C-alpha cells in the first residue's frame, strides 16, 4: 500500500508552465495537441530533490542523461530545487550534507544497481562517472550558487 503522506504533489511552477506540441499518427488514430508541462530546468530541480531524498540510482541516471544531451541553466535548476525543497517543508541541505548523503547511498549495492534492469541493452552508464558529472555540475555549486528571485 502506498503511504500517501510520502507522496508529493506540487501545484505551482517556479519558472512558469510551458506548452509542448504532441502528435500521434498511426493506422488507428491521428491527432495533435499541446501538453502543459514544466521547463526542463524545473524538472531537473525536482529530480535533484529526488536525488537527495530517495535511494534510487535512477535519479542519478536521469540527471546525468539529461545534462549530457541538452544545454541547461544550472542556476535555474538550483533555484527550482531550493523552492521545491522549501515547499516540502525541508531546508535545502548544504553542499557538505548533500555530499555525505550521496556517499552513503553510493556505498549501497542496491542504489548502484537500481537502474541496471531498466536500461536497454547497450546503454552505457557508470554510476561513478555520472556521480562525478552531477557532483561537479550541481552539488559542488551549492555553496556558491546565488539565489535569484523569479521576475
Regions found by a protein language model. Give the residues of each.
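Structured mid-to-C-terminal alpha-helical surface segments
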Residues: 1-151
Amino acid at each position: 500500500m502506498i503511504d500517501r503522506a510520502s507522496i508529493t504533489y506540487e501545484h505551482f511552477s517556479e519558472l512558469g508552465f510551458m506548452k509542448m506540441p504532441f502528435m500521434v499518427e498511426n493506422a488507428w488514430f491521428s491527432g495533435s495537441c499541446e501538453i502543459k508541462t514544466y521547463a526542463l530546468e524545473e524538472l531537473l530541480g525536482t529530480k535533484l530533490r529526488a536525488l537527495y531524498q530517495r535511494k534510487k540510482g535512477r535519479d542519478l541516471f536521469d540527471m546525468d542523461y539529461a545534462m549530457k544531451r541538452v544545454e541547461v541553466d544550472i542556476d535555474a535548476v538550483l533555484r527550482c530545487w531550493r523552492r521545491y525543497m522549501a515547499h516540502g517543508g525541508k531546508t535545502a541541505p548544504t553542499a557538505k550534507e548533500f555530499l555525505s548523503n550521496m556517499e552513503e547511498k553510493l556505498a549501497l549495492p542496491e542504489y548502484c544497481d537500481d537502474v541496471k534492469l531498466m536500461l536497454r541493452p547497450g546503454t552505457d552508464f557508470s554510476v561513478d562517472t555520472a556521480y562525478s558529472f552531477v557532483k561537479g555540475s550541481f552539488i559542488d555549486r551549492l555553496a556558491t550558487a546565488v539565489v535569484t528571485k523569479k521576475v
